[in-house]
Amino acid sequence: MCLLSLPLLLFLQYTRAKAGEVIGGTECKPHSRPYMAYLEIVSSEGYEKDCGGFLIRRNFVLTAAHCAGRSLTVNLGVHNKKMKEDTWQRLKVIKQFLHPNYNSSVLLHDIMLLKLEKKANLTLAVGTLPLPPECNFLTSGRMCRAAGWGRTNVEEPASDTLQEVKLRLMDPQACKHFPNFNHNLQLCVGNPRKRKSVFKGDSGGPLLCAGIAQGIVSYAHRNAKPPVVFTRISHYRPWINKILKAN
């Protein structure tokens, strides 16, 4: 093992929220992030919610485990989620692979693979995103990018268009106020002196560092103040590879 790095849960409601909406960012150039997936979810209780995710194989999307539901539909090639284009590909999820050690109470091992009903067609607007190797060292201070659909401010309604924001990888000490933060399993991201962050709503989107998906949006403060916590993808490469090989 490599030792490196949308309802709220009632018992977490005073400290953190499931994350994903971009605050302090800018609108992406349409279809410049062809790996992005917009997930429409019907929860186990029957209500609708949404998440982000990203295409890693033509028939597999990677996202957060807390985005699981009774049924999921993946939308690819989306820029404005309210404005359907010819670029869209809408695919049903036929199987959800939550990490076997996922803990919903503390949001550890917050990672899930989604198998699609068929392979996506790769186009200029739909493409895959590479993953890091298992032992992949990331230095604090490095600048990365996160993307998602959602609020551009805590009090604002969700954005219809895909937004992105630059975020700094922080020393794990910056996340010590999150009682269950685990540096081996998670990344601490976002300068607390900046009003740039991701927030509740569109969890599951990627943290992109030099063209590689290094993290998955997991949770943040309820007030959206950074830093925020991402699942560290490199730790889960053996599990990801096992699922992909078997399917």
UniProtKB/Swiss-Prot annotation:
Glycan-modified residues: 103, 121
Record GO biological process: proteolysis
Propeptide positions: 18-21
Signal sequence segment: 1-17
One GO location term (cellular component): cytoplasm
Compartment list: Secreted; Cytoplasmic granule
Name of the protein in question: Chymase
Gene designation per UniProt: CMA1
